[in-house]
Amino acid sequence: FVHWGGTPVDLDGIKEVVELAYERFGFRPMVIEDAAHAIGAEWKGRRIGSLESGNICVFSTQAIKHLTTGDGGIITLPNKELYKRCKLLRWYGIDRDKRNYQGKDFRLESDVTEYGFKMHMNDLSATLGLANLPHLDRILAGHRANAEFYNKALQGVNGVTLLEPPEGGLSSYWIYTFHVQNKMDFIAF
């Protein structure tokens, strides 16, 4: 599911669905939270991706996001097994722990255990992200202040419906989203 525009979904509702699946089918499906827009968003006082949910959570740190590394992202994982698997897949499936440099065994089959991808962050991008991290709360406060301005300005405008986060949710407002009944009338307004 997607925390669209930085607005968190009802995580309690998602948890209910997971528990219902367990009751009916005997397993708890793994949930992946698409939090590309939602770094700094909160559900019931806890930041999205804090692992309280037990879900996999992915964030974007692309150039125009709240926290940027130029490009790339962050993944939070609920257990060590998934961490090891993601670490393996991020660099072509190379298992660096299986390399045998002492015995000079540099054969490909000795360290590539499965096909992977090139999805690791380089040091320069990571440094950029770490340098931006202390500014995240200030950036979030600015986006939330802008959203409050829009809420006041659009309150009561005919044909406009403001979209509020679900009760217990605090949006990061990467995107300010609202609904208009008639787009052309709104543009003319």
Residue ranges and their predicted role:
Residues 1-69, 74-82:
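Active-site phosphate-binding strand-loop segment of PLP-dependent enzymes
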Residues 1-2, 7-16, 20, 24-26, ...:
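PLP-dependent aminotransferase class I/II
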